[in-house]
């Protein structure tokens, strides 16, 4: 005796979504455009996809979504050097990831499937092949692991034609289950099925409400991480350096983001670069220059001798110079002074130590992006003063006004940029974030034997327990 054939609709029958169906397509397109380094084109591409889908629907034609998307990308010159197969493979990985995380089993139908005895198939009006549905059902541990889609046959349930294409349904008792009164009830009945209607309950789409300051800060960090990733793709850089201190926390969260999104960026690597303004400023040393190459720093922080010495962590070694000379102009006008000569030699030696350290870690082995909390990006300026540097861009949480003569090129920020639009809260805001996002391993002040030398802040160490609790909460 032939077994009964049981067929099931997939969407809103076997599987339900936590979101609107269009959302999975929109989000997947965003990740695909990010993969291509064109995230700014996301909205335009989404509109074109929806318009083309509408055209297919009006013509009563079926399609594969990946072919439709690749066609739009080619037509709009958005492939960015990637071949069709690479983009299709990336799309399939992204879309499966999104649907896997946005769907859940319909308990009512799963119980029904478990009690049905016979051959079981899914029949879906959908724009992928059946292997995609099989993979998704397998992930959700649904026992219906074979079936067909409208895209594969070029006809749909809504028109009734898809049922006619399935030989197994002929000459057998057939029971179909679904939620759509036209496609799953009327058309299935017309094709000879007994039918079971699954009434879909309208589910309210929950909007995320921020409950506390930790969640507010978490969204800031998440947006910063996404900003870094977007910059990496735009600049075609797979190496990302996070500066010490706040960078330790930023890297931890960026790595977490990479682990929670589609695995389409396997070439991206992240490292902590032990660096600081004090450790890097000597890179600008130029003995033939009037101010030894440090005019930018002097413009920012003043011409006091003690301030100048602090640039290089040499204030204790050369404290005598603070009383001997009125300011840096006075100091550098006496270069024949043995102590001033010794100071200049100390700065030159520090430059060599910093350069040797960067060479030892192969800092310039490939194009890179650097990440820091902000202020004005002076560490980036110091690093980029080297002839053969490979830094392509600097990503910052926020940027203050650049001083006259300071470069604003290759720098961008995610929260604010006072060079474009002034925000009154920024000084307090960044200072607060600098405290909350800080690391407790001390500030790098020099390099000894190609290893960073650090200066500990005992006040920070005393508050370390509170800081760790806050960072874990974020």
Which role fits each region the language model picked out?
Residues 2-48:
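Active-site neighborhood of HAD-like aspartate-dependent phosphohydrolases
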Residues 84-138, 147-151:
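Substrate-recognition element of Asp-dependent hydrolases with the DxDx(T/V) motif
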Residues 162, 180-195, 380:
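Acidic, divalent-metal-coordinating active-site segment for phosphoryl/phosphodiester hydrolysis
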Residues 30-32, 40-94:
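A metal-dependent, Asp-based hydrolase signature
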Residues 167, 201-224:
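Flexible inter-domain linker/hinge segments
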Residues 213, 217, 224, 282-297, ...:
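Long, contiguous domain-sized segments
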Residues 7, 125, 237-244, 368-371:
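Short glycine-rich phosphate-binding loop at a beta-alpha junction
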Residues 157-184, 368-369:
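Conserved Lys-Pro-Asp/Glu-containing loop-to-beta segment of HAD-superfamily phosphomonoesterases
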